Amino acid sequence: MDLNTIWFILISVLFVGFFFLEGFDYGVGILHPLLSKDDKKRRVTINTIGTFWDGNEVWVITAGGAMFAAFPHWYATLFSGFYIALMILLVGLIVRGVSFEFRSKDKSPRWRNLWDWMLFVGSAIPALLWGVAVANLIRGVPIDENMNYVGGFFNLLNPYALLGDRKSVV
């Protein structure tokens, strides 16, 4: 087995680990305002992921770093082509993290309801965009001879990718 294959397997394991662990967190965040009807039950659902939710992002950061180190052209093409989608994904993750922290800062029902819905949005958007990204990678993205992505953000939202985003949420 050559070094490229070993790196590819390592990066794949890191992404699979991230999606496996983070998928549970996304699911809790998406279902949180829909299934938990009172504040006590909502607190319990948040506590199921509260101790380790932020540690799961280490997997994707490590995968991105390994991709940058082992396959810089792949990294540059992927991140420049999916730049807008990844920035929206990042905003969703920030909203999600802030909602975990700010929800408990005030006991007002309106305040908590706001952050419960921010947790929903901050979990749904990244799950949807990860589905779009993975579906596009499986389908294939337009890359020119210089390894530059030649599509736009809305080219990523093709029917196959939109099916993939729904599958990632489910």
Residue ranges and their predicted role:
Residues 52-123, 137, 141-144:
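Membrane-interface helix-loop-helix modules in multi-pass inner-membrane proteins
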Residues 150-166:
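Short aromatic-rich membrane-water interface segments that cap or initiate transmembrane helices
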Residues 9-19, 23-26, 30, 58, ...:
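Hydrophobic alpha-helical transmembrane segments of multipass integral membrane proteins
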Residues 47, 148-151:
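Conserved catalytic-core motifs characterized by acidic clusters
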Residues 2-10, 42, 75-81, 108-117, ...:
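Membrane-interfacial loop-to-transmembrane-helix junctions in polytopic alpha-helical membrane proteins
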Residues 1-55, 61-64:
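N-terminal signal-anchor module of multipass membrane proteins
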Residues 169:
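Conserved small/polar residues in nucleotide/adenosyl-binding loops
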Residues 22, 145, 152-155:
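Intrinsic disorder/low-complexity signature
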